[in-house]
Amino acid sequence: MARAAFIVCLLMACAWSSHAVMFKLSPNTQKCLKEDIQANQLVMGEFEVSDVPGQIIDYIARDTKGHILSQKEHITKGKFSFMSEVYDTYEICFISKVPAHQRGVIQEVSLLTKKGVETKSYEGIGEASKLKPLEVDLKRLEDLSDSIVRDFVLMRKREEEMRDTNEKTNSRVLFFSIFSMCCLLGLATWQVLYLRRYFKAKKLIE
């Protein structure tokens, strides 16, 4: 019973988890944050940057192919959201721009991101469906469990793909090694026969 309660509490904590970071951005530089995200997941975020007169910070969210999913210029504070179409590594970049005639100042950037189950408003769902608080918690846990199962399935799939790739690579390396040894043996045999004919022609051996 205690173990079950611990698992429920752990799932509840995960359900409310989010990713918050704060970093410093030097003048005329950019910093990107990357994360692997499953397909068809909603990603939401909030950002805030310290205001420095004359300095500009832009942000852009994109995938590995360079497709822009969200973008905004001259940011100070705001929100963004985008939907991941495929499983990929997505990045959010903050870009500092300072005029040449101005001495740049380091700015602070804070970012809070949520994805998947974390983006759902279960209070709103509970009110719309007239659910009791316990039923809302159970709904949250159900969605979180489904999300965890999907993560494990994806990890298993990637593990199988990596194992297949390793097996194919090992087979190719073995084939190449055998081919190289055969080539070396063939070359050595040819050299022995050539030298034997050469020495016979010079009458150095019979």
Swiss-Prot record:
Subcellular location, principal: membrane
Domain GOLD: 30-140
Effect of I106V: In strain: MEL11, MEL12, ZBMEL82, ZBMEL131, ZBMEL186, ZBMEL191 and ZBMEL229
Residues spanning the signal sequence: 1-20
KO phenotype (gene knockout): Mutant embryos exhibit reduced dpp signaling during early embryogenesis. Maternal tkv is not active and is not secreted.
Spans within the Lumenal topological domain: 21-172
Transmembrane segments: 173-193
Keywords: Developmental protein, Membrane, Signal, Transmembrane, Transmembrane helix
One GO term of the biological process aspect: endoplasmic reticulum to Golgi vesicle-mediated transport
Domain of life, source organism: Eukaryota
One Gene Ontology term of the molecular function aspect: cargo receptor activity
Subcellular location: Membrane
Cytoplasmic side: 194-206
Family the UniProt entry places it in: Belongs to the EMP24/GP25L family.
Protein function: Eca and bai are essential, though not redundant, for dorsoventral patterning of the embryo. Specifically required during early embryogenesis for the activity of maternal tkv, while the zygotic tkv is not affected.
Name of the protein: Transmembrane emp24 domain-containing protein bai
Organism: Drosophila melanogaster
Native organism taxonomy: Eukaryota, Metazoa, Ecdysozoa, Arthropoda, Hexapoda
